[in-house]
C-alpha cells in the first residue's frame, strides 16, 4: 500500500513520475545478456500498466530479451518524455528496476483483456504460441524530472496489491459512460484541452483513469492514489465540481 513518504520528494514530483508512467506505453528494457555474460542488453518494448502500478509485458520466447530473462530475471525499464524544444538532457525520465516474472495462470485472461484494450494490435500475437505475459516486480525506482529534480522513490508505493474496487471496475466504467458522460468530457477538456462529446472511459487505475477519444487514449490523473470504491466515487464527484467550467 502506498505510503507517500513526505521526506522523499514533494507530492507534485511523485505525481509527475506516476503520470509519466501512466501516459506512455513504450520504453527501453534492459536485461542481462545470456550470450555476452555481464553485459546489459537493451530492447525497445511496449507495456501496459495495471490497475495498481504493476508493469505488464507481452513478449515472444524467441526474443533475445526473453532468453536473457529466463537465465536472469533482473531487469530495468526506462521510459521518458523527450523535451524536443529545449535541452534534451532536461527531459523527464523514470527508471524501474526489478525482476520479470510470468503472470500467474489465474490472472492471464484479465491481463490479456487489459493488454488488448490498450494495445489492440497485440491481439494478433495471441495466436502465436511463443508469446507470453510477464510482469515486472518493481524493487527500485529512479525519477529524474529535470535538472535538480532527482530522487529514488519509495518501492513500497509500487507494490502489486490490488485495490478494493478492482472487481467492480467494469460496473464503475459502465456507470460513468451511461450516466456521467459530462464528467468525462469536462475532465478531458480540463487536463488535455480536448473537446469531445463522444469520449468514453475504458479503464481504471489507482492513480486515475483512461478515456478514449477519436481512437486515442488519454490518462486523467488524480491528486492521490485511490484504493476504495467509495473514495473513487468521491474523487470523481470532486472532479465534476472542479471541472464544471470545462463542460461542453
What are these regions (language model features)?
Residues 26, 42-46, 95-97, 133-135:
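Conserved hydrophobic/aromatic beta-strand scaffold that supports enzyme active sites
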Residues 52-55:
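Short active-site oxyanion
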Residues 126-248:
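C-terminal edge-of-domain segments
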Residues 30-34, 48-50, 80, 144, ...:
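A generic structural motif
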Residues 1-11:
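Single conserved hydrophobic/aromatic residue that forms the stacking wall/gate
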Residues 62-124, 128-131, 138-140, 217:
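Short, structured beta-strand-loop surface elements
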Residues 19-35, 45, 75-79:
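A short, Trp-centered hydrophobic/proline-enriched beta-strand micro-motif
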Residues 38-39:
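Intrinsically disordered, low-complexity regions enriched in acidic/Ser/Thr/Pro/Gln residues
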Amino acid at each position: 500500500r502506498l505510503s507517500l513518504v513526505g521526506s522523499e520528494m514533494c507530492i507534485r514530483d511523485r505525481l509527475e513520475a506516476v503520470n509519466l508512467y501512466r501516459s506512455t506505453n513504450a520504453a527501453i528494457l534492459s536485461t542481462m545478456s545470456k550470450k555476452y555474460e555481464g553485459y546489459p542488453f537493451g530492447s525497445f518494448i511496449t507495456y501496459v500498466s495495471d490497475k495498481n502500478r504493476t508493469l505488464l509485458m507481452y513478449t515472444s520466447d524467441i526474443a533475445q530479451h526473453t532468453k536473457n530473462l529466463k537465465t536472469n530475471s533482473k531487469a530495468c525499464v526506462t521510459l521518458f518524455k523527450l523535451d524536443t524544444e529545449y535541452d534534451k538532457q532536461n527531459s523527464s525520465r523514470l527508471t524501474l528496476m526489478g525482476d520479470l516474472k510470468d503472470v500467474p495462470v489465474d490472472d492471464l485472461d484479465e491481463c490479456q483483456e487489459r493488454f488488448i484494450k490498450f494495445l489492440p494490435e497485440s491481439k494478433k500475437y495471441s495466436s502465436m504460441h511463443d508469446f507470453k505475459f510477464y510482469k515486472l516486480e518493481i524493487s527500485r525506482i529512479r525519477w529524474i524530472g529535470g535538472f535538480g529534480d532527482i530522487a529514488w522513490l519509495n518501492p513500497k508505493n509500487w507494490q502489486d496489491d490490488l485495490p478494493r474496487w478492482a472487481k467492480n471496475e467494469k460496473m464503475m466504467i459502465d456507470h460513468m459512460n451511461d450516466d456521467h458522460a459530462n464528467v468525462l468530457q469536462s475532465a478531458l477538456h480540463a487536463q488535455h484541452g480536448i473537446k469531445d462529446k463522444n469520449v468514453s472511459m475504458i479503464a481504471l487505475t489507482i492513480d486515475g483513469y483512461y478515456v478514449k477519444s477519436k481512437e486515442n487514449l488519454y490518462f486523467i490523473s488524480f491528486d492521490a492514489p485511490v484504493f476504495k470504491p467509495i473514495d473513487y466515487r468521491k474523487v470523481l464527484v470532486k472532479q465534476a465540481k472542479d471541472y464544471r467550467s470545462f463542460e461542453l
